[in-house]
Amino acid sequence: MIQVFSERKDKPVQYGFVDLGGAPLPNEVDYPTVEFSTSPDGINWTSAYDVKNMENVHCYSSPNVPVAKKTNQTKKIGFQDGERIVSTSFDSRELKFKLVYKGVSQTDAMLAFESAQRFLVSREAYWITFADWLGRMYYGTAVMGDPEFSVNDWTCEVTFTDLMGLSRSIGTSLSPVEDEWGVNNNVPNNGDYPPYTFKENKFSVYNLSDIYIDPERQGHQLKIVVKGAAGDNFQIKNLTTGDYIKRPKGFSGTWELDGVNPTLNNEGDLLNITGTHGGVITLNNGKNDFQVDNFSGEISFDFPFWRLS
């Protein structure tokens, strides 16, 4: 399990009704709060609530549902009317959220802003996620607008540039479902979460992303791990896309296809491989039917899910 958010029991919350003559609890505030965390690698996370010098710095307005910005590369075909799409890519986009600080002195307010800036502003891109949009993370960099000070308080708008133009699941297809798959995740209509480890030679792999998975042209992560024994002409074929990868010579042990790089028992295996584009497997959106020839053992598919929002 990946620990994304703080384990504190006293996280800031907006208070509700208070008994006559009563007072809010120390962790209750008069505005909504949304926890957010950052990570350099998508695995090791730091919540803003766990940064000591950001005490009382809260996100009170998280980003709206991000809009996907698509660009089509088109080409004129002979004398045909119009144009045809050659390729499609998603452009970077901006996610805006707002911070608020309420303190006891102007000095504390300035120090809190400095700490927030250190937490969010970096030369290097990183991942960010928000607790009200579970299971999704965005990769990019942030800039902070000028703070609006009011005695001991301030508010500030943060602009995060999502460099990929898509969100990614924090977990992968092999992660525990309840931990990292997120909400609104394209699970099939029967509501059952599909498996991604198989012992059969015919099975279906569900790509729950909003886009197809293409390790070669898009650099998407896709690791196929085969453990067992294979005879000559071992082959994995995606019957839905027509992609296949083939190894003429048999083997035993662990064979992996990590993106476009095949290995056998941790040794490079590219020279022994044939197939689509030299042995590349892609996944369509939704259901992909697979067939594995001349193999006995276990095969798993490990990849993150990509969302438009």
What kind of feature is each model-predicted range?
Residues 1-73:
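Polar/acidic, low-complexity leader/linker segments enriched in S/T/G and N/D
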Residues 2-7, 174-309:
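Intrinsically disordered, low-complexity segments enriched in serine, threonine, and glycine
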Residues 48-99, 112-117:
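Glycine/small-residue-rich interface belts in oligomeric ring/scaffold proteins
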Residues 79-107, 152-166, 288:
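Oligomerization/assembly interface segments of phage tail-like spikes and tubes
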Residues 89-93, 120-122, 150-154, 216-218, ...:
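Solvent-exposed loop and beta-edge segments used for protein-protein assembly and interaction
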Residues 100-127:
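Structured, non-membrane catalytic/scaffold regions adjacent to prosthetic-group chemistry
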Residues 109-117, 156, 172-176:
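"Short basic amphipathic alpha-helical interaction patches in structured regions
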Residues 122-169:
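Short beta-strand and beta-hairpin "edge-sheet" elements
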